[in-house]
From Swiss-Prot:
It comes from Ureaplasma parvum serovar 3 (strain ATCC 700970). Residues 5-68 form the J domain. This is Chaperone protein DnaJ. Keywords: Chaperone, Cytoplasm, DNA replication, Metal-binding, Repeat, Stress response, Zinc, Zinc-finger. The gene is dnaJ. Zn(2+) 1 binds at C148, C151, C205, C208.
Length: 375
């Protein structure tokens, strides 16, 4: 049976941020977990965990986006395994499902940093081409979670109503039996009753309704440095969610709107410059519009259309130049012939006189064609 698409299983788009994927997983995991839903489908619950295990890991997600279920799923060379399916009575499985899910989940229950990663906020920021090139101060608005001031993050109406979780006995984790090809294996996971805190509240705070956090609208000005490029991730420290009085980070994922007139290749910029054909013949100084304004360059006489010229150091700012000593990118422009301006009778007569001269390049090409048709 063909495996379902991981994005479809979690109900998210292929462009979903890590935060959106985490939120979708938590919602589905609670809804379909056997401890909370006695009629839960074990197969669906396994699919949900499998999908999240891949999509929550940037390397595995990239490989899945490229290869799908048939390709590698992000195993490191140290693991000694490569993804495979079949071979045991027609049962499809991935070796990572058997080993990785146990050890990864077990370790995450003891490693609070995995939990805290979910409190970072990821936003997509759209920039115009020149905003990215020159840098800009950008105002952004977004929602974040902060610790409820009324209950101080307990979720309870009264601090006395906060009790030790009876399911995990305050550990924040519980043991589950997982059935595999190798038998039943015990797996330590986050307690679903107290969500890993080890405590539950018998009453609900009147402000946060037991959620322990409240929403806050943030208006923030961020500085986008010159030379910011498509696909970059900018860190804004301590501007994410605030949970248990700990400030988490905001990540801005950059999208740059393409320019109509400039093309990027690394730090280099490419453009086209239109000149009068007469100027191309006689040569001289021409003006080139760059991202830094107008620059002048000198072209030789008889400059052909398509000739490329370079203006050194006039490309994208290299933000790492102070560290590695690398120069900025270069600016390249390709010559294009503009439609000639209207000429006077005397100018036309002068050009007609010149045009009667034999051009060896024209004759050479004509003779090549004649040779072809005379075969």
């Amino acid at each position: 049976m063909a495996k379902r698409d991981y994005y479809e299983i979690l109900g998210v788009s292929k462009s979903a941020t890590p935060e959106e994927i985490k939120a979708a997983f938590r919602k589905l995991a609670k809804e379909h977990h056997p401890d909370r839903n006695k009629s839960a489908d074990d197969t669906l619950f396994k699919e949900i965990n499998e999908a999240y295990e891949v999509l929550s890991d940037s390397k595995k997600r990239a490989q899945y986006d490229q290869f799908g279920h048939d390709g590698p799923q992000g195993f490191s060379s140290a693991s000694g395994f490569s993804g495979f399916s079949g071979g045991f009575g027609g049962v499809d499985f991935d070796i990572n499902d058997i080993f990785g899910s146990f050890f990864n989940n077990a370790s995450s229950s003891h490693n609070s940093s995995n939990q805290y990663e979910t409190y970072d906020i990821h936003l997509r920021l759209h920039l115009d081409f020149m905003e990215a090139v020159n840098g800009i101060s950008k105002n952004i608005n977004y929602d974040r979670k902060i610790t409820c001031h009324k209950c101080q993050g307990t979720g309870a109406k009264d601090p006395k109503d906060v009790k030790i979780c009876t399911k995990c006995h305050g550990r924040g984790t519980s043991i589950e039996n997982v059935h595999s090809l190798f038998g039943t294996i015990q797996q330590e996971v986050e307690c679903h009753e107290c969500e890993g805190t080890g405590k539950v509240a018998s009453s609900k705070c009147e402000q946060c309704y037991g959620k322990k956090v409240i929403n806050e609208r943030v208006n923030l000005t961020v500085e986008i440095p010159a030379g910011t490029r498509e696909g970059e991730k900018l860190l804004v420290s301590k501007k994410g969610n605030i949970v248990n009085n700990q400030e988490f980070d905001l990540y801005l994922h950059i999208s740059v709107k393409p320019s109509k007139y400039f093309a990027l290749d690394g730090l280099d910029i490419y453009s086209e410059t239109y000149i009068d054909p007469i100027k191309a013949i006689v040569g001289g100084i021409i003006e080139v519009v760059t991202i830094n304004g107008i620059k002048t360059i000198e072209i030789p006489s008889n400059t052909p259309e398509g000739k490329k010229f370079r203006i050194s150091g006039s490309g994208i700012v290299n933000k790492k130049s102070n560290i590695f000593g690398k120069k900025n990118g270069d600016f390249y422009t390709t010559i294009r012939y503009a439609k000639p301006v209207e000429l006077s009778k005397d100018e036309i007569a002068y050009l007609k006189n010149i045009s009667t001269r034999t051009n060896q390049n024209v004759e050479y090409y004509k003779n090549k064609v004649l040779k072809e048709i005379s075969k």
